[in-house]
Curated annotation (Swiss-Prot):
Self-association state and partner proteins as the record states: Interacts with Raf and ksr; Dsor1 binding to ksr probably promotes ksr and Raf dimerization and ksr-mediated Raf transactivation.
GO CC entries: condensed chromosome; cytosol
Organism: Drosophila melanogaster (Fruit fly)
Catalytic function, reaction form: L-seryl-[protein] + ATP = O-phospho-L-seryl-[protein] + ADP + H(+); L-threonyl-[protein] + ATP = O-phospho-L-threonyl-[protein] + ADP + H(+); L-tyrosyl-[protein] + ATP = O-phospho-L-tyrosyl-[protein] + ADP + H(+)
Record-given protein name: Dual specificity mitogen-activated protein kinase kinase dSOR1
Name of the coding gene: Dsor1
Length: 396
């Protein structure tokens, strides 16, 4: 593969994700109500939804979480085959990675969904392969993974229909909040680590695209990850649309070398620094900028005025590969949080902490024990009707 003068390459085809999708036990074929095969992925499967429900019993989750997933699967069973005609557009939720995400209503059940539309000009065989690979998502049922209703192809677009998270993505929340409190970030990180561990241990899936816009929250306080790489063919077909994603990629991915789930750890660490200080941390902000972020009036003033100059994309990627990684240096952050970020952002993947180490880190242990009202914080930040009493939602 040829490299540019900065010794960087575009992200390679994801052979690992393709292999992972191929090695996972296939979901039983989905059928239309009449029993004929369809390119939609949400007809009722030959095996009942009970088969998926049974798999929940062996997973590490609480009774409330298990009950919520069972309710989701029950709703999913009632929907039947998905098609464009059955989805009423309610508004746009966001865009990125070559697609737009719409809020839609399923007209027969009145269920609200998030529909991601990805425009693809591909041959029929490629289209079928993408739909086939996306079937793996039916198997991904976990408290910290966004639920999947199905996918279909219509008018040159792949539609992926997912669970609607009314709090939105963390990049949108970050714009509203200015920065995200450490106590909130602790719970978010715990959820992301559990989600990544589930994908790896149960489905041999590497996420490949961890960043704030792919971490979603809702007014019930749930935290879920989305947009992970189950379809190697879809990733390959969209290879030129991942400009924003590259800024969160690990040095080894940017250099085109072998990568693993350790690459997701780098992306998580970089995302944490961004959410903690309220701005993308490469190049790092100077002392004056940091002081303006954490000044007493920072919550009212929004983003600091003296931000680092914007870098061209290849200049930015060269910085990620060749310069020291970002750090959390302000005194407002705990020592444990700073250490957690540091072990996520080691330049060499074999020196970077793994998922097991991170899940047992003192900062995560503290987050598990600390009472933090994610629901109240989300509702307060995004002006949503409160669903639980608010407690411990202060910014520090």
């Amino acid at each position: 593969m040829s490299k540019n003068k900065l010794n960087l390459v575009l992200p390679p085809v994801n052979t690992e994700a393709t292999v992972a999708a191929a090695t996972v036990a296939p979901t039983p074929p989905f059928k239309t109500p009449s029993g004929t095969d369809t390119h939609s992925l949400l007809g009722k499967p030959k095996t009942s939804i009970d088969a998926l429900t049974e798999t929940l019993e062996g997973l590490d989750m609480g009774d409330t979480e298990r009950k919520r997933i069972k309710m989701f699967l029950s709703q999913k069973e009632k929907i039947g085959e998905l098609s464009d005609e059955d989805l009423e557009k309610l508004g746009e939720l966001g865009s990125g990675n070559g697609g737009v995400v719409m809020k839609v209503r399923h007209t027969h059940t009145h269920l609200i969904m998030a529909r991601k539309l990805i425009h693809l000009e591909v041959k029929p065989a490629i289209k079928k392969q993408i739909l086939r690979e996306l079937k793996v998502l039916h198997e991904c049922n976990f408290p910290h993974i966004v639920g999947f209703y199905g996918a279909f192809y219509s008018d040159g677009e792949i539609s992926i229909c997912m669970e609607y998270m009314d709090g939105g993505s963390l990049d949108l929340i970050l714009k509203r909040a200015g920065r995200i409190p450490e106590s909130i970030l602790g719970r978010i990180t715990l959820a992301v680590l559990k989600g990544l561990s589930y994908l790896r241990d149960n489905h041999a899936i590497i996420h490949r695209d961890v960043k704030p816009s792919n971490i979603l929250v809702n007014s019930s306080g749930e935290i879920k990850i989305c947009d992970f790489g189950v379809s190697g063919q879809l990733i390959d077909s969209m290879a030129n649309s991942f400009v924003g994603t590259r800024s969160y990629m690990s040095p080894e991915r940017l250099q085109g070398t072998h990568y693993s789930v350790q690459s997701d750890i780098w992306s998580l660490g970089l995302s944490l620094v961004e959410m903690a200080i309220g701005m993308y941390p490469i190049p790092p902000p100077n002392t004056a900028t940091l002081e303006s972020i954490f000044a007493d009036n920072a919550e009212e003033s929004g983003q600091p005025t003296d931000e680092p100059r914007a870098m061209a994309i290849f200049e930015l990627l060269d910085y990620i590969v060749n310069e020291p990684p970002p750090k959390l240096e302000h005194k407002i952050f705990s020592t444990e949080f700073k250490d957690f970020v540091d072990i996520c952002l080691k330049k060499q993947p074999d020196e970077r902490a793994d998922l097991k180490t991170l899940l047992s880190h003192p900062w995560i242990r503290k987050a598990e024990l600390e009472e933090v009202d994610i629901s109240g914080w989300v509702c307060k930040t995004m002006d949503l009707p409160p669903s639980t009493p608010k407690r411990n939602t202060s910014p520090n």
